[in-house]
From Swiss-Prot:
Residues 53-223 form the Helicase ATP-binding domain. It is found in: Cytoplasm. The keyword RNA-binding applies. It is an enzyme of class 3 (hydrolase). ATP-dependent RNA helicase which is a subunit of the eIF4F complex involved in cap recognition and is required for mRNA binding to ribosome. In the current model of translation initiation, eIF4A unwinds RNA secondary structures in the 5'-UTR of mRNAs which is necessary to allow efficient binding of the small ribosomal subunit, and subsequent scanning for the initiator codon. Belongs to the DEAD box helicase family. eIF4A subfamily. It catalyses: ATP + H2O = ADP + phosphate + H(+). The gene is TIF1. This is ATP-dependent RNA helicase eIF4A. Its EC number is 3.6.4.13. It comes from Yarrowia lipolytica (strain CLIB 122 / E 150). SUPFAM superfamilies: P-loop containing nucleoside triphosphate hydrolases. ATP binds at residues 66-73. GO terms for cellular component: cytoplasmic stress granule.
Length: 395
């Protein structure tokens, strides 16, 4: 499992495909792809990856009913990269997402996994330069990820040629088909070769999604992931505009001077950042403990025990802990980095409100993070407001 991924119990999955592969090494992946997966921080496949990667690699159409937070982005990214011929620098996989932010997130994952394959992946999204899209696509890319309108436009202009597309991936299909995207998505489908494999991911199965599966999918493998209902109810969510990355530490120290917190969890996106912040806070005379994916299990147990008993007041970690940490005293969660994928947000800040306790989440936001902040608000139908000056009274 990667630090940035939550997992689900295998009993929560139903499928008409029985084979389960519990190690990335046993999936028959290209060596360069494996290097990219492990380099990204993944250790073992999540439950959905154990079941879905193989049927996709084998060429089956796959219909996965899965909420965010189950590892589905990595599932289709790994599968697409395995089936791409990196020597042919033309679009071979087409991934459609409902928002620009999600498209960018997927692009980052594809590029990270495909680093050693020398994969070119372009995000083709509205609100950006059409001329730049044309230039990049004509220079040659292996994977296109984007929003329906712009992708449809590029196909209409005959810039994006679909004749070599092997795999078509529709993420958050229910969200797109319930909005204004139905017509462009249908039009895109009709431009694809008959042999194109379709992978469709959807949290729910409304009539619009079932209509697409009936029209465009051939005997799909079905994977249903039931997911715990999580809520942001009871969690007060704030952000601090830190402007740039280098100011975060100073802001954190200032914050700790104004509040009195029994315990807090601080989330960072990388192991390196956890190590840096641990050292910096220790040198500033804070009592902190930390753990991430490279921390030995025995050491993790010691650290968690110290945190549970209160002998450690600040725990710094990656998304390794974004699920399953039963620490009742945690009243404050600080996202030193906004999560790199939206689904981990609810698992991170859900720490604060467990067992009916109220909690506060404070997000450090750089000038580059405002798009992601808006995306989190949209995705969770919530409001994240600027931190008030009387924050100490709210914790």
């Amino acid at each position: 499992m990667a630090d940035g991924l939550t997992d689900i119990d295998s009993s929560q999955i139903t499928t008409n495909y029985d084979e389960v592969v519990t190690s990335f090494d046993d999936l028959g992946l290209k060596d360069e792809l494996l290097r990219g997966i492990y380099g990204y921080g993944f250790e073992n496949p999540s439950s959905i990856q154990q079941r879905a990667i193989l049927p996709v690699i084998k060429g089956n159409d796959v219909l996965a009913q899965a909420q965010s937070g189950t590892g589905k982005t990595a599932t289709f990214s790994i599968s697409a990269l395995q089936n791409i011929d990196e020597k042919i620098k033309k679009p071979q996989a087409l991934i459609i997402a409902p928002t620009r932010e999600l498209a960018h997130q997927i692009q980052k994952v594809v590029l990270a996994f495909g680093e050693y394959m020398k994969i070119e992946c372009h995000a083709c999204i509205g609100g950006t330069s059409v001329a730049e899209d044309i230039r990049v696509i004509q220079e040659g890319v292996h994977v296109i990820v984007g929003t329906p309108g712009r992708i449809h436009d590029m196909i209409e202009r005959r810039i994006l040629k679909t004749d070599l597309i092997k795999m078509f991936i529709l993420d958050e299909a229910d969200e797109m088909l319930s909005r204004e995207f139905k017509d462009p998505i249908y039009d895109i489908f009709t431009t694809l070769p008959e042999t194109t494999q379709t992978v469709l991911l959807s949290a729910t199965m409304p009539a619009e999604v079932l209509d697409i599966t009936g029209k465009f999918m051939r005997d799909p493998v079905r994977i249903l992931v039931k997911k715990d209902e999580l809520t942001l109810e009871g969690i007060k969510q704030f952000y601090i505009d830190v402007e740039q990355e280098s100011y975060k530490f100073e802001v954190l120290c200032d914050l700790y001077e104004t509040i009195n917190v029994s315990q807090a969890v601080i989330f960072c996106n990388t192991r390196r950042k956890v190590d840096y912040l641990t050292q910096a806070l220790t040198e500033a005379d804070f009592t902190v403990s930390s753990m991430h994916g490279e921390t030995e299990q025995s050491q993790r147990d010691v650290i968690m025990k110290a945190f549970r008993t209160g002998s450690s007041r600040i725990l710094i970690t990656t998304d390794l802990l974004a699920r399953g940490i039963d620490v009742q005293q945690v009243s404050l969660v600080i996202n030193f980095d906004l999560p790199s994928n939206r689904e981990n947000y609810i698992h991170r800040i859900g720490r604060g409100g467990r067992f009916g306790r109220k909690g506060v989440a404070i997000n450090f936001v750089t000038s580059e993070d405002h798009g992601m902040l808006k995306e989190l608000e949209r995705f969770y139908s919530t409001e994240i407001v600027e931190m008030p000056t009387n924050i100490a009274d709210l914790i």
